[in-house]
């Protein structure tokens, strides 16, 4: 490791001390860690890069069950977009996640389902899971679903969603999960793009104490989905007013009871697709990312085991939805492939109160907790009193996913939730990567709050100069984050549109995988994610990372969340506009005071915060105080909407019903127009 240079490009690394894993982490391990030293990680990483055939070949045989052994570990390249792994092998993902564990440990919990209302919760053992998966697979098989067919799943985060995914995989078919929050139009687009033959859904959903009419949305979508032949409807609430279309729709309970006994899984080739997952937030036609069976499954198992330091005795609580990649990889395929119980949570962090997540951790003695920073910000806003009610001493690893975690949230997570006794694992990856790209391996890699740390096995991260397209060498540098070689769990294509796949990920920098994110590598070789490269503001020739400015703003003790966008300016090209949500008690104080002077004072402090932390060139020209920022159902801030508002295009926002808080948009428009004197 080198010492810090006098002038740092990566200023985030200033005054950040490395934090070693606390001794309590090791005391809570059920057995010795899978990796016991930083040197061992470095040796394994070097082997994974220099000899990937041997490295991944050994792990492929260790972690997966094969119906037919593979003949070759890898082929193809990023340049040609023809990556393939474990050629000649055959396996079944469902068998790997269910059968082998049901035979070995039939009474071990597989799915720990925590419903929106606790009274509806249930635990499924591996034996019970196998039985229910075989029943649903039997229904699908009787409908003619076979290897290579696509099946859409539109369900809330419950046990049946997991069962449905596994049942589809059991037949060698391809599941396409659609987040149960998308509109009927979004369902239609995804079903049609994937040419789905069947849909699995439910009558209604429960979330945050509210009932959601899931079946009604599906019915609206299916008016224009000619490929759908059959629909299986799980009775989540049992509302008798929910109706079925004769000849198309069938009740889950009635159909599954027709099938009993063991239904053998269908072996598929390593490169056969396991699932499609449509990326969210983009305009135009949906983009169905294709993941293979063997490579994806190995990536899920390998990262779950090593990044989190997961053991058979552990319990993984991933507070994510199967409608997104986090739920696929770390609520289903990662833990279940290893025979580790997974907590499936249907509800929200705030219902019935802000202690719900911690109550679940205590109840099931979860050892690993994995959540998005958005949820952590919400929970910090509510105060620590709810955390103190529960015994969280079972926790060993605290994970973060979905967006960069700011140092202040990292510290809060570490101190208030983990009591300074856990390893915080900030993970960087994507829908397209399938599994973790960059993460500090639990119990091994020292942490720097705000940094995702170092690359995982087989991931050759690098930084590219966006102007020259040349790889940037050395440390204390910044550029576009890319990967130099294929890895097992990488997405293989965009469904029915390989040209789009090439143009989006592989052609921008030939020979590299383009992540779309900017990043920096500090003097120790740690990576700092700076957000999407299109989330850049160009002010007077200065290319400013919005994530960087947001991180500076968040350090102001009044701010709960911040989002920065660029706004056109005749003089400087663009100016920085910051939308900030205040902590609850400050919102109340401002409303009670109704004093513009107090708000103005706060805004000046925020601008000064950025001037001091980054420099005058990065200071926002305008700060808009709002009650809430627009977010997707997965918790990501929709900066696209804020950019439209700042551009004076509030009448061109498109469909905002898929937001978790669409009501926030009108308030933001009002605050923006008020500040800029618009009627």
From Swiss-Prot:
InterPro entries documented for this protein: Ac_CoA_lig, ACAS_N, AMP-bd_C, AMP-bd_C_sf, AMP-binding_CS, AMP-dep_synth/lig_dom, ANL_N_sf
Pfam families per UniProt: ACAS_N (PF16177), AMP-binding (PF00501), AMP-binding_C (PF13193)
Protein name: Acetyl-coenzyme A synthetase 2
Record key words, sorted: ATP-binding, Ligase, Nucleotide-binding
EC number of the protein: 6.2.1.1
Protein family per UniProt: Belongs to the ATP-dependent AMP-binding enzyme family.
The organism's place on the tree of life at top rank: Eukaryota
Transmembrane region(s): none
């Amino acid at each position: 490791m080198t010492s810090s240079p006098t002038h740092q490009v990566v200023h985030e690394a200033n005054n950040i001390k490395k934090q070693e894993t606390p001794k309590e982490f090791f005391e809570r391990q059920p057995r010795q860690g899978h990796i016991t030293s930083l040197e061992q990680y470095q040796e394994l990483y070097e082997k994974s890069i220099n000899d990937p055939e041997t490295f991944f070949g050994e792990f492929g045989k260790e972690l997966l069950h094969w119906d037919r052994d593979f003949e070759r570990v890898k082929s193809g390249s990023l340049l040609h977009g023809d990556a393939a792994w474990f050629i000649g092998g055959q396996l079944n993902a469902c068998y790997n996640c269910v059968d082998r564990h049901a035979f070995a440990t039939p009474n071990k919990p597989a799915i720990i389902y925590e419903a929106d209302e606790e009274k509806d919760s249930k635990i499924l053992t591996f034996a019970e899971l196998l039985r229910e998966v075989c029943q649903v697979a039997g229904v699908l098989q009787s409908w003619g679903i076979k290897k290579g067919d696509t099946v859409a799943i539109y369900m809330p985060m419950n046990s049946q969603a997991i069962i449905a995914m596994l049942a589809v995989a059991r037949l060698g078919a391809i599941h396409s999960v659609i987040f149960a929050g998308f509109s009927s139009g979004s369902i239609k687009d995804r079903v049609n793009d994937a040419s789905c033959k069947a849909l699995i859904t439910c009558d209604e959903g429960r979330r945050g104490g509210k009932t959601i009419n899931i079946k009604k949305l599906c019915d609206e979508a299916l008016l224009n989905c000619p490929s759908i032949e059959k629909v299986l409807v799980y009775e989540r609430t049992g509302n008798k007013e929910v109706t079925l279309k004769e000849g198309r729709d069938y009740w889950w309970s009635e159909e599954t009871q027709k099938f009993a006994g063991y239904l053998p899984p269908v072996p598929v080739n390593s490169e056969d697709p396991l699932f499609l997952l449509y990326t969210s937030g983009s305009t135009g036609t949906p983009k169905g990312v294709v993941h293979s069976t063997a490579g994806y499954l190995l990536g899920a198992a390998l990262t779950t085991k090593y990044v989190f330091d997961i053991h058979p005795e552990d319990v993984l609580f991933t507070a994510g939805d199967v409608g997104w990649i986090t739920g696929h990889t770390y609520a289903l395929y990662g833990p279940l492939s290893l025979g580790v119980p997974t907590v499936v949570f249907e509800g929200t962090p705030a219902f019935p109160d802000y202690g719900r997540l911690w109550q679940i951790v205590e109840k099931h003695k979860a050892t690993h907790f994995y959540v998005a920073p958005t949820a952590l910000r919400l929970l910090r806003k509510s105060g620590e009193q709810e955390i103190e009610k529960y015994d969280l001493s079972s926790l060993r690893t605290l994970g973060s996913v979905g967006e960069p975690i700011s140092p202040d949230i990292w510290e809060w997570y570490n101190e208030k939730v983990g009591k300074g006794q856990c390893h915080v694992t900030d993970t960087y990856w994507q829908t397209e990567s399938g599994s973790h790209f960059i993460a500090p391996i639990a119990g091994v890699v020292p942490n720097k709050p705000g940094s995702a740390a170092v690359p995982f096995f087989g991931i050759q991260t690098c930084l590219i100069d966006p102007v020259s397209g040349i790889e940037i060498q050395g440390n204390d540098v910044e550029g576009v984050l890319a990967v130099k070689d294929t890895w097992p769990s990488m997405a293989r294509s965009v469904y029915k549109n390989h040209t789009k796949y090439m143009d989006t990920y592989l052609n921008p920098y030939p020979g590299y995988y383009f992540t779309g994110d900017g990043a920096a590598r500090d003097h120790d070789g740690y990576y700092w994610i700076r957000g999407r490269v299109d989330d850049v503001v160009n002010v007077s020739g200065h290319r400013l990372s919005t994530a960087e400015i947001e991180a500076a703003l968040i350090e102001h003790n009044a701010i709960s969340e911040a989002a920065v966008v660029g706004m056109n300016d005749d003089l400087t090209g663009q100016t920085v506009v910051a939308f900030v949500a205040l902590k609850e008690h400050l919102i109340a104080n401002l409303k009670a005071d109704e004093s513009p002077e107090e708000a103005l004072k706060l805004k000046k402090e925020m601008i000064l915060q950025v001037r001091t932390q980054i420099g005058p060139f990065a200071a926002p020209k305008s700060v808009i105080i709002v009650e809430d920022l627009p977010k997707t159902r997965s918790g990501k801030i929709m900066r696209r909407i804020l950019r439209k508002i700042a551009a004076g295009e509030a009448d061109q926002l498109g469909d905002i019903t898929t937001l978790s808080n669409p009501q926030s948009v009108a308030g933001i428009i009002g605050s923006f127009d008020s500040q800029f004197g618009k009627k």
